[in-house]
Each structure stands twice: as structure tokens, then as C-alpha cells.
Amino acid sequence: MAKTVFHSSIEGAQHGGKTLDEFVNFAKNAGAVGAEPSNYHLEDENGGFKSAIEIRETFDKYDMKLDGISCHCPIWVHTTAWTESKTIRPFLPKNIWTKSAIEIEAWTEKYIFRFLELSAELGIKIVPMFWGMSHGFEVATGYPFGFFEGPEYDLISEGNERFVNKTSGIRQKANDYGIYLCHEIHPNTAALCADDFNMLVTSCDDDPCLGVTADPSHCWEGEDFETRFRKVGTRIYAAAVKNFVIRSGLNLRSMT
């Protein structure tokens, strides 16, 4: 007899304006069997997280499966804070983003530790996310035209070392809990293509917690999804399936 392996589910990262109850209710009414809230849906009103019991009760209320919990923004901020970019501000409380880069990095690391602890309590093994700008904006944006190595500098090797050092605590926690941190290969992150991701894995001595979320809609810079996901296939633990069209003739990067 045939056995159902997959079920319909909804990613919650695009539903940040909803409460956890509103999001799970929305997913139920949309016809999904499960849902994946983001870290923000799980926050309480006191700067912490809801209890695992409260979260479970919300899903049980609607007879929905908890398929995972994403944590894109805090992890991106953690590996981007060193750049002192203002673009981390939308994802942080004002009393945090006004602090120094070192203080912001320390705060987000503690936040991520608490998030991973809660995820483990809920039995979560897969966390969709993306690493931040560990190698800097020059490398991630392609400027200045690939001159990533020059007199007394090597942005790639420096970035690899930075990634290893800054993520070591988070990776250790994930491994302790048996959680896979599934990076979405994506512009303006630590890995823009499959080769970049494999470089990170090598730099981290093949750390088993480093995974990939396969999302074909992110293949908009020339690397098609078959090329990308064959290269990182052994590291794929999550996937996102969407209706999408990559339109030709449009500039990917624009200031207007």
C-alpha cells in the first residue's frame, strides 16, 4: 500500500506580521498540513521565547504539524555585524542596534543559543537559515571586479577564517543538539553559489551541522538548480518549492 511521504507545508518567514496563532490558523485555512514558523513567531512579550508547551498547544489547537523553525535574520545579523552595516537594523530592537558591532554579535549569539535550545526541546532537527556577510560586501557583490586578493590582503581566505571563528559556537551548539543549520544559497550571504558553500564546509573541516535548504527560486544569477544542487546534494536537508519565474532582460542589482 502506498504511504504518504510528503505533506503540504507553509514557510512562515514571509508572514512576520502575524502572531504564531494567526500564522498557524492561516496555514490551516490555506490547506496545509504543517507549518514552519520563524523565530519571530515564537518570541514572547518579554524579550524571550514562548515555552515549548505553549507552541505545541498552538499547533495542536489547529491539528497542524510543526515542520521546522527558521532563523534567517538573527543568524544573518550575527555574521554581518562586524561590517557595521546599517542593514542589520530592521532585524533588531533599537536598544540593540545602537550598540557596537562586538556587542551586537554577542547579543545575537546568545539569542541564537536560546533559539537552538528551544528548537531541541521541540524536537526540531532542521533549521532553514542563511549565514551573513562573513566575507564582506566586496566579495558578496562582486566589486571591485574580482580583485579579492592583492597587496597584503586576501578577502577570501580572511573571510573563511572569519566564518570559522565567528560561527564556531553556533555550530557547536547545533551539533550538540543534532540540529542541521540549512543555509539558503543566496546573494549577499556567506555562500552565493554551490562552490562557495562547499568552500565553507571545507574551511570548517566538514562540520556535519552545515546543511543546505534547496530553493530553485534562488538560482537567479546563472547557476541553474540542477548544477547547484548536484554539487551540494549530500548536504541538502530541507527544500522550498515555489511558483516562480526568472525574468530575462532585468538587471539583478539596481539602486533605483
Residue ranges and their predicted role:
Residues 36-61, 82, 131-138:
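Glycine-rich, proline-tolerant flexible connector loops at the mouths of alpha/beta enzymes
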Residues 22-25, 46-67, 111-125, 224-237:
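Short amphipathic alpha-helices and their capping/turn segments at secondary-structure boundaries
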Residues 11-18, 24, 45-48, 194-198, ...:
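Gly/Pro-rich active-site loop or hairpin
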Residues 2-10, 33-37, 66-71, 127-129, ...:
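Hydrophobic faces of well-ordered beta-strands that scaffold small-molecule active sites
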Residues 3, 22-32:
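A short, Lys/Arg-enriched amphipathic alpha-helix followed by its capping loop at the start of a domain
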Residues 74-81, 133-139, 221, 244-255:
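Flexible glycine/acidic-rich beta-alpha junction loops that bind and position SAM and/or redox cofactors
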Residues 9-11, 39-41, 72-75, 131-135, ...:
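Active-site-proximal loop/turn and secondary-structure-junction residues that shape catalytic pockets
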Residues 17, 22, 80-212:
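Active-site acidic/histidine proton-transfer and metal-coordination neighborhood
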